[in-house]
Amino acid sequence: DIYNNDMSLVEEFLNVDSSIIEMEKNSDLIRMEMNIVEFPIFSRSNKLKTNQIKKYYFSNNKESYLEVVPRHGGIIPGELEERIFIALTKILRNNGFKATFYCTMNDIFDNMKIENINTRRTLYPKVKSGLDRLASTNFRFKNLFYSSELGRPIDDFINTNILTYRAIKFKDANNKEQSFFADKRLKEIYAITFSKQFHDNVIKKGYLTFDADLLLKIKDPVTRSIFTMITKWRYKSLYLKKQAYFIARRIPLAWDKNPRRTVLRIEKSLQDLKDDFYIKDFKTNKNKKWEQADFEIFFDEL
């Protein structure tokens, strides 16, 4: 039982059903498969607690949910783990999308765009712990994947981690692996294997439609989330209109207590995206009440 005495559960209702129904009234929208980019895989909280499970409900009847379960004594993945993950997807691409590939810690730092040697030394134990968190956290998806073949969500349960890894020292390396140790200062290399669900879903449909360097330049995790969402939702269109509530529920950001604060938070992220030329422009429409606010977002030609 994952709910032992030491573990605490935090539940959050994202109530996506109503926003999806609203979205599907718009007949010119293509129903795209919901993929892992759209789930709160990486927590946006900077107050993560040890042994805390997060459970996100995507329907009022609790039939559709994502549960993120840390290893015992650990915390769930957050902002650092997302940056490591994006860097690993880039290394994966450079290795021809093979599910298992080799890399060094310096490869990860290179792809995270961390160049300063002292910063690397400081971050080394944190990135190593982050890699461990990607391997040891369980993600339990219930009724969340949409099949375009069937034309409906699939009624299933998936329990998976993001990846597994093997840390290999020179004395244990085979002939192929020893070639990585040409640099004698290197202590170990990593054989990384993405789980089938993440390899199939993220790699084929998700993060690899994005430029990893562009994502990593967005320092704020909420802004990064908003960018990935609006990019996916707009598809090839140069204009997107979305309710603030809809955006907030998918990050996720708190809504019920203070919609005004959340709308202004989204607005700040959109302003940052505009300032850095990720989007062309945007307009906030309050529509009399903050609860009814929406955003119009404009993009440059692809």
List where the protein language model places each region.
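Charged, alpha-helix-forming regions
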Residues: 1-302
